[in-house]
Structure formats: C-alpha cells, structure tokens
UniProtKB/Swiss-Prot annotation:
The keyword Magnesium does not apply. Its main location: cytoplasm. It comes from Methanocella arvoryzae (strain DSM 22066 / NBRC 105507 / MRE50). One of its GO terms (molecular function) is dCMP kinase activity. It catalyses: CMP + ATP = CDP + ADP; dCMP + ATP = dCDP + ADP. This is Cytidylate kinase. Its EC number is 2.7.4.25. It is found in: Cytoplasm.
Length: 175
C-alpha cells in the first residue's frame, strides 16, 4: 500500500507520519527531511534554500525523482511531502492543513525560534513554493481536489488526526 501525506509546513505531517508508520509498519520517505538536509549541507536557512530552489529546478526535481524511486522499493510506504500527493501513484492521498498562526507556533517550538520569526519564514517559504510549483509543475497548491482526505489539524492533536486516518486506511483495506 502506498499512502501520500502532504500539507503545509507545520501542519503535523511528520508527527502523523510517525503514528502511521508505527501502526502499519510503513517505511516513511520524507521530502521535507531531504530538503532540510540539503539546506543544512549548504549552510542555508530554509528560506534561503527555497529562494535558491526557485531558480534551480534541479533541486525539486531530484527530490521528486528520489521519492518516486524509493516508493517503488517497498510494499508498504508512506511518502511525506508537499507534492507527494500529486507526483506519486498512491492508494490514498492525504492533505493536512492548519491556519498559519498555529503552524508558526508549532514551528517555533520545533525549531526553538521566536514565533514571529517562524511566522515570517513560513509565510515567505509558502509564497516561494506557490511560485516554484506553479512554474515547474503548473501546480496550484491551493487546489486540493486531487486528495482523498483533507484534515484541518488545528482541531486535533497528532493522535486525533492519526485516528481519523487509521479509520480511512482500515476502510480502504476492506474495499
């Protein structure tokens, strides 16, 4: 089974991915983790690296290609990433969304940075990604019609969101 888990920065993708991997034994492939590693290797912030990626399509294309290759190597895989639901053939595509204010608080806690900085950097990153994905893929990130399940994660913690997804996966397995 292949599941994609996409969503906005700070929407809870990584936390939910861990819950799903634990319950179903999914191998998790994370685009965000790859992107953060590449940024760190170059000594850049995510905002700086995002601006670089805006002018260098090889960065996104390499991450996408790697995800596609890895997703074919395992029988049960969860592919986590902003574009995963649009670029990976999957049994279920999930999108997590949350208001920016809440996501900034989560990112602030995760990265140990002030909330205002997390807000500004996340907002800048999203503007950059909207432009980048439209330019490279002709994708409108605000169009969620390709997803089977869209969840507002401001209403539940990671376990609550995961329990909703567990039910959807269990029903899919019955079909």
């Amino acid at each position: 089974m292949i599941i994609t888990l996409s969503g906005q920065p700070g929407s809870g993708k990584t936390s939910v991915a861990k819950e799903l991997a634990e319950k179903y034994g999914f191998v998790v492939i994370s685009a965000g983790e790859q992107f953060r590693k590449l940024a760190a290797e170059r000594g850049m912030t995510l905002e700086e690296f995002g601006r670089l990626a805006e002018n260098d399509p090889s960065i996104d294309l390499a991450i996408d290609q790697r995800q596609k290759e890895l997703s074919r190597q395992f029988p049960n895989v969860l592919v986590e990433g902003r574009l995963a639901g649009r670029t990976i053939e999957a049994d279920m595509r999930i999108w997590l969304k949350t208001p920016l204010r809440i996501r900034a608080e989560r990112i602030s806690n995760r990265e140990n940075i002030p909330v205002h900085r997390a807000y500004d950097e996340t907002h800048a990153r999203e503007i950059c990604e909207l432009s980048r994905y439209k330019k490279y893929y002709d994708i409108d990130l605000t169009d969620l019609s390709c997803y089977d399940l869209v969840i507002d994660t401001s209403k539940w913690d990671a376990k609550g969101v995961s329990s909703i997804i567990f039910k959807a996966i269990d029903e899919l397995k019955k079909a």
